[in-house]
């Protein structure tokens, strides 16, 4: 309720601080010393798609769908997720996913490099565990150093994304956002 109220009536400071919570979450995931693996079953959208984007590996079921539908609410992708998506799939697919705002199919996500693997739904937990055990069996210090190095390379340009929270807060003031939000909240359930 607090977040919805802030989006309706809150000032820019409140809105940017709320967006910072998501950025802090993704930075925390990136900063975990151990290897992180997202196991995606069903739909993963918006913030739910940003979380696996920040993980080291992503395994999805053959019928999972993932997307960033923020644009449909006249909002940009925030939380610092844009460079993470860009580094996974490149500029053209990032634009397709973020500007298009559609939920993408597992087959395409795998072909683009967003998903590392797809498995039948009944194999998701066992395959995720198998992969976790594999990486956990590697020398911890070396794995941690490699992960930190790769993340540093991956995020070399992320500093320019400081403004995504401000852009997001500003976008929520637009008439397009108000109309899209009202349509979303009033849709038939």
Regions found by a protein language model. Give the residues of each.
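C-terminal long alpha-helix characteristic of the crotonase
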Residues: 59-64, 115-162
């Amino acid at each position: 309720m607090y977040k919805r109220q802030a989006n309706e009536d809150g000032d820019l400071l409140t809105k940017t601080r709320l967006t910072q919570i998501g950025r802090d979450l993704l930075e925390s995931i990136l900063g975990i010393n151990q290897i992180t693996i997202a196991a995606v079953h069903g739909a993963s959208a918006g913030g739910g798609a940003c979380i696996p984007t920040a993980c080291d590996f992503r395994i999805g079921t053959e019928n999972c769908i993932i997307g960033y539908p923020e644009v449909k609410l006249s909002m940009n992708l925030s939380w610092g997720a844009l460079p993470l998506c860009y580094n996974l799939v490149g500029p053209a697919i990032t634009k397709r996913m973020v500007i298009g705002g559609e939920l993408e199919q597992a087959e395409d996500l795998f072909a683009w490099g967003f998903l590392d693997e797809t498995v039948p739904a009944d194999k998701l937990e066992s395959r995720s565990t198998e992969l976790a055990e594999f990486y956990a069996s590697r020398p911890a210090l070396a794995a941690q150093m490699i992960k930190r190095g790769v993340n540093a390379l991956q995020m070399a340009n992320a500093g320019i994304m400081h403004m995504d929270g401000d852009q997001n807060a500003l976008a929520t003031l637009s008439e397009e956002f108000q109309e899209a939000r009202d349509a979303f909240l009033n849709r038939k359930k």
